[in-house]
Amino acid sequence: VLITTYNFKVEEFVPDRIKVNARLDQEQLKPGNTTQLLIDALNYYGPPAANRNYELEVQVKEKTFAPQAYPQFDFAISNRSSFFDKVVRQGKTDAGGKAVESWQVPALYANMGLLQARFFATVFDENGRPVSRNTTAAIQTQPVMLGIGAVGNSYYALNQPARFPLIALNTAEKEA
């Protein structure tokens, strides 16, 4: 007696052969600062992943500064164009399965608000299969963030004064 049937698919699963850790020596950066990404690759159940190809990719994007204590204020810089280059570097791990890459925050990122750098480290096993890890760092491009408050009106009469609340906060979200 057949009660029911069920269709299913079987996929081949190949676990990662190496373990990759990536960490930065700094979590907070400023324009002109240099940080180092430390990559550590180990073979599972074996020695360090020596002489393996790796790739580092650094992406910088805008990060929203939105303090919870001041939800009525907008801290965005709205009339600027974003231009963040993607950095890609390649190399080989040393005999201990380690690699170190330095990256300097460009000085031209000054006064661009709050940014975030994301570091993608990819190490390739002996068959060329990638194993990736990422880590992030905040880039504080200015010591004080200026916010303009919402007043609820989107239309103001011609030649009439309009009042807008302003606030200056440091990056710790305290009044400057």
Cite the ranges covered by each PLM segment.
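A structural signal for beta-strand and strand-to-loop patches characteristic of beta-rich domains
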Residues: 1-176
